[in-house]
Regions:
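Bacterial N-terminal signal peptides
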Residues: 7-17
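Extracellular/periplasmic carbohydrate-active domains that bind, remodel
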Residues: 17-216
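Bacterial N-terminal signal peptides that target proteins for export
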Residues: 1-7
Length: 216
């Protein structure tokens, strides 16, 4: 039995201060120009990372996730002065391989989930567009029960990824995207200043525990 989706729409919410719009835009870096396949099977993390790194190194701009394709990817990190823009019907899909997730947002505490899309000690980062970021949550679960999924056995290490983790970022905009199917927390903000979250949708499976929407 499928759980009801949880819809959480945020409209013009300002977190942690009055936020200006990051100075992104400018040059566009299409991730397919850096080798991304967008077939939903190939791990496109290296191509996405290359586009982000080049964009930031060149002074900033927009990293484009093109419309109508699914880009399966392992963890990657954001960079200063970069707007990650998801075109309509595009999707970033978390790699279901648990071994890909090795970094915890809680330093040495590896029992509270890992990071998938993340950034730390950055300036002017934004995630925009009407595409989707899909945490592929069921792939990290055990057996489906009537009202929940079993958690796979863990000791001091829980590989379930948080979808988006931002640590000590100065100026962040998250706008219009749909974030869905998280295996753990969805948006996790730690020590960030000047954050705007506007018009996003969070659609998580209620049978997956710890599927928080936004944790500050």
């Amino acid at each position: 039995m499928r759980a009801k989706a949880f819809l959480f729409v945020l409209c013009s919410i300002l977190l942690l201060g009055a936020c200006g719009t990051p100075k992104t835009g400018g040059t566009i870096y299409n991730i397919m120009d850096y080798g991304a396949k967008g077939d939903g099977v190939t791990d496109d993390a290296a191509a996405i990372q290359a586009a982000i790194d080049q964009c930031s190194k060149s002074g900033g701009g927009t990293v484009l996730v093109p419309a109508g394709r699914t880009f399966m990817c392992s963890p990657f990190h954001l960079a200063s002065f970069v707007e990650l823009h998801l075109e309509p019907n595009s999707c970033l899909l978390a790699n279901p391989d648990e071994a890909a997730y090795t970094l915890s947002a809680f330093r040495d505490n590896r029992g509270e989930g890992m990071m998938w899309i993340y950034g730390q000690d950055l300036k002017e980062v934004s995630i925009t567009g009407t595409g989707a970021i899909d945490g592929n949550g069921v792939s990290f679960m055990g057996k489906e029960l009537e009202d929940s999924y079993e958690l796979k056995p863990v000791t001091d290490f829980d590989p379930r990824p948080h979808v988006l983790t931002l640590i000590d970022i100065e100026k962040t905009v998250i706008r219009d995207v749909t974030i869905r199917n998280s295996a753990y927390w969805t948006v996790h903000l730690i020590g960030c200043n000047d954050v705007s979250i506007d018009g996003i949708s969070i659609l998580n499976n209620l049978k997956i525990r710890n599927g928080d929407g936004i944790d500050v």
